Design a protein with these regions (language model features):
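N-terminal charged helix/coil linker that caps or initiates catalytic domains
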Residues: 1-29
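Glycine-rich phosphate/adenylate-binding loop
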Residues: 2, 115-119, 124-129, 143-144, ...
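Conserved N-terminal Rossmann-fold NAD(P)-binding element of oxidoreductases
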Residues: 30-32, 55
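Hydrophobic/small residue at the entry helix of a nucleotide-binding pocket
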Residues: 36
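Glycine-rich phosphate-binding loop and adjoining beta1-alpha1-beta2 segment
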Residues: 49, 54-92
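Acidic/polar active-site rim loop that often engages polyanionic ligands
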Residues: 63-70, 153-163
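Conserved SAM/SAH-binding loop
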Residues: 101-109
Length: 285
């Protein structure tokens, strides 16, 4: 048995060869490979996705270690997408992984050629950039899935999937909807979101991110390193909220699950497959 076949033998056992071939042909792009996007990327590669583009402008910070897949004490200061790509290729060396150290904005949107992809995954934190991606992605023929806020959560049983306009109890979704209404710009079609209606409060001390006490890449690379230009993102956040790995990972896994189930729905004879969109929407509604 070839190594490539052996890697995905257990997946093929469940889904069948035709479904695995379908998965391998899909092209996916993920925007944001932090606490949610990094786990989504690994799950997709382990599930058989071979054509994956990962987009993030940031470098690994020591405060990422508690929740981001590629963040370790050895990767602090490295470009996130490069560190993640290296890990993904150890899982499937034949995968075609494109790592883009870029940020998605209204100004850079044309650089990503979204029309080339079958699936677009949104794991962006910035409200403005997230809104811009949603509007553009919904103009393409690609399937689009989005993550709402994963911070200030503890209970994994409250994580769910529903259509964007049906999301309840999530401040990020509320802010996005208000922005769309205020600017009178709306997504051209409905799309599924992963979210939680839980909202806790920060119980610890104020974060030092972006201050002189910050332990981000400058602590390892030195204050003269040009990569610190990207560190502005940390200090520009209005508020730093607490996050936990088990929550962000579940968000990422559920996004990956939406891709895999959508890609295999028309092929697999296993009843549970393909039912997630309808079932979760009904529960949330």
């Amino acid at each position: 048995m070839a190594i490539q076949d052996a890697i995905f033998r257990r997946s093929e056992l469940l889904l069948g060869n035709e479904a695995m071939e379908r998965i391998a042909q899909k092209r996916v792009i993920i925007f944001g490979v932090g606490g949610v996007g990094s786990w989504c990327a690994e799950s997709l590669v382990r599930s058989g996705i071979r054509q994956l583009t990962i987009v993030d402008s940031d470098r690994v910070c020591i405060t990422n270690i508690n929740r981001q897949l590629m963040a370790t004490t050895k990767t602090v200061g490295l470009v996130k997408v490069d560190a993640l790509k290296e890990r993904l290729l150890t899982i499937n060396p034949s995968a075609d992984i494109t790592a883009l150290q870029k940020i998605f904005t209204e100004e850079t949107a044309g650089e990503f050629h979204l029309e080339d992809y079958d699936y677009i995954i949104d794991a962006i934190d910035s409200l403005k950039d997230k809104a811009a991606l949603i509007l553009l992605a919904c103009q393409t023929k690609a399937k689009f899935f989005s993550s709402m806020g994963a911070a200030l959560k503890l209970d994994p049983t409250r994580i769910q999937i529903t259509e964007f306009w049906k999301v309840k109890g999530d401040p990020l979704a509320r802010a996005l909807r208000n922005k769309f209404k205020k600017e009178k710009q709306f997504p051209k079609h409905k799309f599924q979101c992963v979210y939680s209606d839980e909202l806790l409060k920060n119980m610890g001390h104020n974060a030092t991110c972006g201050t002189e006490q910050c332990m981000c890449p400058k602590a390892k690379n030195g204050p003269g390193d040009p990569s610190l230009l990207n560190h502005e993102w940390c200090s520009s956040k209005a508020q730093i909220n607490g996050t936990l790995a088990h929550i962000t990972a579940i968000f990422g896994f559920m996004l990956a699950g939406l891709v895999v189930q959508d890609a295999t729905t028309s092929i697999s004879t296993n009843a549970p497959l393909g039912n997630v969109l309808t079932a979760t929407a009904e529960r949330a509604g």
